[in-house]
Every structure is written in structure tokens, then in C-alpha cells.
């Protein structure tokens, strides 16, 4: 991200975290915390906090672009080497992304003139790429998340919470104890394959499980299997901001989800300087931008487009 843009968006993120309600586990002292700073491609890891107040104080001094805690519990979560942490068990995770569920349209723009192109190269430079996610696509992914949640309950007796990722997908999390927590990667791989490649011996509509589902036309679900298998996975903290879009990571309750501007916490308007010339669709609204021509736009939209690399936020007014 551009340094000037970073400064403004970092201020917005910092102001958000002053009052943000982060949904933290009751055993947070057993979790490893991590974050990605602004202007850095690497994570700061092996952090440990004993209270929400201690965490908030830290992130106000070190504003995160992305903020995580571990799905695993550890005896020594701040140990620098993974083998020294003392693994005590992990939650069970599922990750759904629009790329795996929908045919996502990827648009390319040449940085020299901002115009859309079909080429993979613009006079020796890579094009600006923007995956345009539709509301229809997000809702399809949400339907798959609900299906996974229901299957976990019906077939395994497990209760999963669903979270919007803050970008273009959903996470499901089963808080595990005892046998569930101690599942090893091979066990978790079998569970992942149960969802992606169901193979019931008999297909009959009246049967429970995948036998009945396949008979009704329900197919296996494309999930990121590595997320489910990994016992040391970092997960986004509910209530944090996803630095790829500036949207909040939120829990979905009562099976209801609306993909819209409310997912961004920012108020007011901003001056947005586009890098591209195009008509862009976001949250079912269309925005026309022209390269190097500043426009006044809703800050929620400006931050989203800036984090997608389509321009920069020059100023904002509450």
C-alpha cells in the first residue's frame, strides 16, 4: 500500500480499535496472538495476553492490518519455537471462500493508463487485478456455510459458529474440548474429506447423512481443506477488521446475513483518487471512477477500493 494511503487508513483502523468489541476466547491466556502490521508482508507472532484490556493496549500501540489468535491452546503460547509451546489441543475450523464456490470475475487494469485489459502484462508491468465479488456470490457461499453447520450438528453432534471473514468468505469454528480438541491432522483430514468427497455406500432419499443428501441433489462442499487439517492455524478475531477489504469479521446469528455497507465501521466521506477507469459494482451499487480524477465517496467504499489496490484515500471527513 502507498505510504500516504497507509497513514489515513491506519488512523481509521486505530480509531476503530479504540472501541471495538473483540470476541475473545475465555482461555485467551492459552492462545497465541499474531498480527500483520501496516507496511509489512510478515506477521508478528508468538504474542500472549492475559486480558482483553492488555490486548487492546497493545494493538492501539501497534495498529494491525490483520489480527489473529490461534485455534490451538498452548502451555506456553509466547514460546518462539512451535515445539516449545506445548500443544494442548485445537478447535475445529472450516474455511469457505468465494473462489471455491462461484465463478469470480477477475478484472485487470493497466497501471500506466488505468484502462481495463485482457492481457497478463502491460508494457512490462503486471496489471492491477481486482476480483469483483457479487452479493449473489457471497450469499451462495453463506448457504454452503449453513449446510456445513447443519451437517456438523446432524452427523457429528458438534455445534459450530459461523463468521463472515471480513472479505469474501466465511469461517466456521467448533470450540473443541477433550477428544475433539485432540484430533490430529489425519483425523481432521478425514473430516474435511467427509464434506468435500462424500461416498455413501447407498444413496436413498429417506436415509440420514450423505446418503439422503446426495439423493436430494446436495453435493460435496468445496472447502479449504488445509485450514481444517492444520492444528496450529491462526484465525481472525471476531470484531477485528480484515485488511484486504476493511470489513468487520462478524458472527452470523439466526441464519440471517446481509452483505452490505454495514459491514464497514467507517463514517463520513472521503476523497478517493482512482488508479483505474471503470464502472465498479460493490454491495449492489455501481460506482464510476476515472484514473487520476479525485471523487468524493462514502468512506466505507473508498477504504474498500483502496485496500483492493484500485486507488488511494487522500482525505476523509466524518
UniProtKB/Swiss-Prot annotation:
Q: Which residues form the active site?
A: 95, 97, 224
Q: Which Pfam families match?
A: PriS_C (PF20873)
Task: Report the cofactors.
Answer: Mg(2+); Mn(2+)
What EC designation does it have?
Answer: 2.7.7.-
**Any one Gene Ontology BP term:** DNA replication, synthesis of primer
Lineage of the species this protein comes from: Archaea, Thermoproteota, Thermoprotei, Sulfolobales, Sulfolobaceae
| NCBIfam families for this protein | PRK00419.1-3 (NF001641)
Domain of life, per UniProt, equals Archaea
Q: Which GO terms describe its molecular function?
A: DNA-directed RNA polymerase activity; metal ion binding
Report the HAMAP family cross-referenced here.
DNA_primase_sml_arc
Keyword Nucleotidyltransferase on entry: yes
Report if keyword Plastid is assigned.
Answer: no
Keywords assigned: DNA replication, DNA-directed RNA polymerase, Magnesium, Manganese, Metal-binding, Nucleotidyltransferase, Primosome, Transcription, Transferase
Q: What InterPro entries does this protein map onto? A: DNA_primase_ssu_euk/arc, DNA_primase_ssu_PriS
Listed GO cellular component terms?
Answer: DNA-directed RNA polymerase complex; primosome complex
The family assignment reads: Belongs to the eukaryotic-type primase small subunit family.
Question: By what name is this protein known?
Answer: DNA primase small subunit PriS
Q: How does it assemble?
A: Heterodimer of a small subunit (PriS) and a large subunit (PriL).
| Gene3D superfamilies linked | DNA primase, PRIM domain
Its job: Catalytic subunit of DNA primase, an RNA polymerase that catalyzes the synthesis of short RNA molecules used as primers for DNA polymerase during DNA replication. The small subunit contains the primase catalytic core and has DNA synthesis activity on its own. Binding to the large subunit stabilizes and modulates the activity, increasing the rate of DNA synthesis while decreasing the length of the DNA fragments, and conferring RNA synthesis capability. The DNA polymerase activity may enable DNA primase to also catalyze primer extension after primer synthesis. May also play a role in DNA repair.
Amino acid at each position: 500500500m502507498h505510504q500516504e494511503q497507509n497513514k489515513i487508513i491506519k488512523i481509521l483502523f486505530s480509531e476503530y480499535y479504540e472501541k471495538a468489541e473483540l470476541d475473545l476466547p475465555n482461555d485467551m491466556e492459552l492462545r497465541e496472538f499474531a498480527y500483520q502490521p501496516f507496511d509489512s508482508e510478515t506477521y508478528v507472532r508468538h504474542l500472549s495476553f492475559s486480558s482483553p484490556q492488555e490486548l487492546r493496549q497493545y494493538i492501539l500501540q501497534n495498529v494491525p492490518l490483520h489480527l489473529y489468535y490461534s485455534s490451538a491452546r498452548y502451555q506456553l503460547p509466547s514460546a518462539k519455537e512451535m515445539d516449545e509451546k506445548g500443544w494442548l489441543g485445537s478447535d475445529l475450523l472450516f474455511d469457505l471462500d468465494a473462489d471455491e464456490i462461484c465463478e469470480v470475475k477477475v478484472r485487470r487494469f493497466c497501471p500506466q493508463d488505468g484502462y481495463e485489459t485482457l492481457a497478463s502484462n502491460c508494457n512490462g508491468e503486471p496489471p492491477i487485478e481486482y476480483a469483483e465479488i457479487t452479493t449473489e456470490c457471497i450469499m451462495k457461499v453463506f448457504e454452503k456455510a449453513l449446510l456445513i453447520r447443519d451437517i456438523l450438528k446432524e452427523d457429528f453432534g458438534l455445534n459450530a459458529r459461523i463468521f463472515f471473514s471480513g472479505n469474501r468468505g466465511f469461517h466456521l469454528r467448533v470450540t473443541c474440548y477433550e477428544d475433539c480438541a485432540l484430533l490430529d491432522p489425519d483425523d481432521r483430514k478425514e473430516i474435511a474429506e467427509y464434506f468435500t468427497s462424500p461416498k455413501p455406500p447407498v444413496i436413498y432419499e429417506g436415509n440420514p447423512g450423505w446418503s439422503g443428501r446426495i439423493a436430494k441433489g446436495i453435493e460435496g462442499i468445496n472447502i479449504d481443506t488445509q485450514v481444517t487439517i492444520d492444528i496450529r492455524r491462526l484465525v481472525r478475531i471476531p470484531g477485528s477488521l480484515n485488511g484486504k477489504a476493511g470489513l468487520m469479521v462478524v458472527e452470523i446469528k439466526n441464519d440471517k446475513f446481509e452483505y452490505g455497507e454495514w459491514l464497514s465501521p467507517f463514517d463520513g466521506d472521503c476523497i478517493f483518487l482512482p488508479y483505474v477507469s471503470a464502472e465498479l459494482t460493490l454491495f449492489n451499487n455501481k460506482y464510476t471512477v476515472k484514473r487520476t480524477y479525485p471523487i468524493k465517496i462514502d468512506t466505507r467504499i473508498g477504504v474498500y477500493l483502496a485496500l483492493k489496490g484500485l486507488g488511494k484515500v487522500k482525505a476523509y471527513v466524518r
